Swiss-Prot record:
EC class (word): hydrolase
Cofactor binding: number and manner: Binds 2 Zn(2+) ions per subunit.
Main location: secreted
Family membership: Belongs to the peptidase M20A family.
Domain of life: Eukaryota
EC number: 3.4.17.-
Catalytic residues, chain numbering: E205
GO terms under biological process: proteolysis
Keyword Transit peptide: no
Record protein name field: Probable carboxypeptidase CPC735_001200
Residue sites binding Zn(2+) 1 per the record: D173, E206
Record lineage: Eukaryota, Fungi, Dikarya, Ascomycota, Pezizomycotina
Length: 452
C-alpha cells in the first residue's frame, strides 16, 4: 500500500468574510464549478477567494457546515442546519434524538439536544442506496479559513482555484464528506429523480459511535435490509478503502503497598510491577502469533498497540500503592476473543504478583478487522488503520446469500493524517474530485439495483 501525504505548503492565512459580503471592486466573472483558472484583480485575493466559495453550491455548503461548531455532544446546531437545508431541497427528513455521551454530563443535562439526520426524497421513502457520515468533530474548535498557496498563483491576474486551501476543525473529518455526499446526491436526483437514495448523518462517531448504534437499533435499520448499498464517508484521500483494522481497548490496574521511599522494602511498588507488564504488552504486535503474540495479516500488516495513558503514585518519597495504564489495540487479524486471551496470557507471564494485577476490557467498541467492498472501477484502493462507524451499524444480512448481502463502501476527501490536528484542511480540488467519486459509487449502486 502506498501512502500519500500533502506536501507542506507555505500558506498565507486569510480570515473568512461572511458569505453575504462581496468585493466592491470591478472584476471579471469567477468560474466556480468549472474551469481551473479564476481571473482576479491584483491585490484582491481575499475577497475573490470568498467569491469562489460563495458561487459554488458545494463549497458554500461545506463552509456553512464547517462554521458551525459541532464538537461531540454539541451537534444540535449543525443538525438543525442540515434539516433546513435538506428540506429546502425537497427531502423528507426524520430527526432521531440521541442522548448525550459520557459521565462528564450532569444527569439533568442528558436530555436529547442532538439528533441523527435521516433524509430521503419524498418519492423514495425506502432508500436502497444510503450515503452516510458523521457531523460531530473532535475538540478544540478551529475557525474556518481560506488560504492560497504561492504555487496556486499563475500570474498577477489569475489563480488556480483547485489549489485554494480550506482549513478548520471538521473541514476534513468529516464535513467534507457530508457536503460532497449531499451535492453528489442532489446532482444525481436532478437527472434521475426516482433513484431510491437516502442520506444518514449521525452524531457521536468520535466518542464511541452512539449515534450509529442508536440508528442501528432503531426500526429504520430494517430486517432484512430494504437497502443494498451503504456508502460511508471518511477522509480516505479519495481512495476506495478495502478494509480497516479492528479495535480493542483495555486497562491494566496494579495494587501495591505504600511505604516511605527511604525504606522501599517495607512496601511494594505498583509502578515497578506494572512496567514489565507494559513492556510485554507493548511488544505483542512484534511477537509471532505462534510465540504468544497478536496476529498479523498480509492485508493489514501488524497488530499495533498504543499505551496512551499511564498513572501511578502520589509523590517521589512514597512507594506507589497503585498504578494503571490504558491501552488501545488495532487488530490486524483474528477475533476479539483470541486477542483478549493473548493479552491476558502476556500480562500473567510478566507479573511478579499476579494477584495484585487486574485487566479490564472495555464493554463496547471492540471488533475484529472490517473488510469492505472495493469492486467499483476507477479508484485507487487502500486499507486504513483508523476506526469508523462501519462496525457500529449492524446490517441484518447475516442470513442472506452472498449475492444478497449489503455492499459497504468507504470513501471520502482529505487525509486522516491532518484530520484531528491543528492543520486540518484540504483543497478545493480534493472536494470537487470527491463529488465525482461519490457520483461514480452511486452510479455503480444504481446499476446493481437495475440488475436485481
Amino acid at each position: 500500500m502506498r501512502v500519500f501525504t500533502l506536501a507542506p505548503l507555505a500558506l498565507l492565512p486569510l480570515v473568512l468574510a461572511r458569505p453575504s459580503q462581496r468585493s466592491s471592486s470591478p472584476q471579471k466573472p469567477i468560474m466556480a464549478d468549472n474551469g481551473d483558472l479564476v481571473m482576479i484583480p491584483e491585490g484582491h485575493e481575499k475577497s475573490n477567494l470568498d467569491e469562489i466559495i460563495a458561487s459554488s453550491k458545494l463549497l458554500s455548503l461545506h463552509r456553512s457546515l464547517s462554521q458551525i461548531e459541532s464538537i461531540s455532544n454539541n451537534e444540535g446546531s449543525v443538525g438543525d442546519f442540515l434539516v433546513e437545508y435538506l428540506e429546502r431541497h425537497g427531502f423528507t427528513v426524520q430527526k432521531q434524538a440521541v442522548p448525550l455521551d459520557g459521565h462528564e454530563v450532569d444527569e439533568e443535562e442528558r436530555k436529547p439536544s442532538r439528533f441523527n439526520v435521516y433524509a430521503y426524497p419524498a418519492s423514495s421513502p425506502s432508500p436502497e442506496i444510503i450515503l452516510t457520515s458523521h457531523i460531530d468533530t473532535v475538540p478544540p474548535y478551529i475557525p474556518y479559513s481560506l488560504s492560497l498557496p504561492p504555487t496556486a498563483s499563475t500570474g498577477s491576474s489569475s489563480i488556480d482555484r483547485r489549489a485554494i486551501h480550506i482549513s478548520g476543525r471538521g473541514t476534513v473529518d468529516a464535513k467534507a464528506s457530508v457536503a460532497c455526499q449531499i451535492i453528489a446526491t442532489l446532482s444525481h436526483l436532478e437527472s434521475n429523480p426516482d433513484t431510491p437514495l437516502g442520506l444518514l448523518f449521525v452524531v457521536s462517531e468520535e466518542t464511541g459511535g452512539q449515534g450509529m448504534h442508536h440508528f442501528s437499533n432503531s426500526p429504520l435499520n430494517t430486517s432484512p435490509p430494504t437497502f443494498h448499498t451503504v456508502i460511508f464517508g471518511e477522509p480516505t484521500e479519495s481512495k476506495l478503502v478495502s478494509g480497516h483494522k479492528g479495535m480493542l481497548h483495555f486497562d491494566v490496574h496494579v495494587r501495591g503497598k505504600p511505604a516511605h521511599s527511604g525504606y522501599p522494602w517495607l512496601g511494594r511498588s505498583a509502578v515497578s510491577e506494572i512496567l514489565p507488564i507494559l513492556s510485554k504488552v507493548d511488544s505483542l504486535g512484534d511477537i509471532p502469533e505462534s510465540e504468544g503474540g497478536l496476529p498479523s495479516s498480509e492485508k493489514y500488516g501488524k497488530t499495533t498497540l498504543n499505551i496512551g495513558v499511564m498513572e501511578g503514585g502520589v509523590a517521589t518519597n512514597v512507594v506507589p500503592a497503585s498504578a494503571s495504564a490504558r491501552v488501545a489495540v488495532r487488530l490486524a487479524g483474528g477475533t476479539v476473543t483470541h486477542a483478549k486471551e493473548t493479552i491476558l496470557a502476556a500480562v500473567r507471564s510478566a507479573s511478579k504478583n499476579p494477584e495484585d494485577v487486574h485487566v479490564s476490557f472495555s464493554a463496547g467498541g471492540a471488533y475484529p478487522p472490517v473488510d469492505l467492498d472495493s469492486d467499483v472501477e476507477g479508484f485507487d484502493v487502500m486499507t486504513v488503520n483508523y476506526g469508523t462507524d462501519v462496525p457500529n451499524w449492524d446490517i441484518h444480512d447475516h442470513d442472506l446469500p452472498d449475492h444478497g448481502k449489503v455492499k459497504r463502501y468507504l470513501y471520502g476527501p482529505g487525509s486522516i493524517f491532518v484530520a484531528h490536528g491543528e492543520n486540518e484542511g484540504l483543497s478545493v480540488g480534493d472536494m470537487e474530485d470527491a463529488v465525482e467519486g461519490y457520483a461514480r459509487l452511486i452510479r455503480a449502486a444504481v446499476g446493481r439495483s437495475e440488475r436485481k
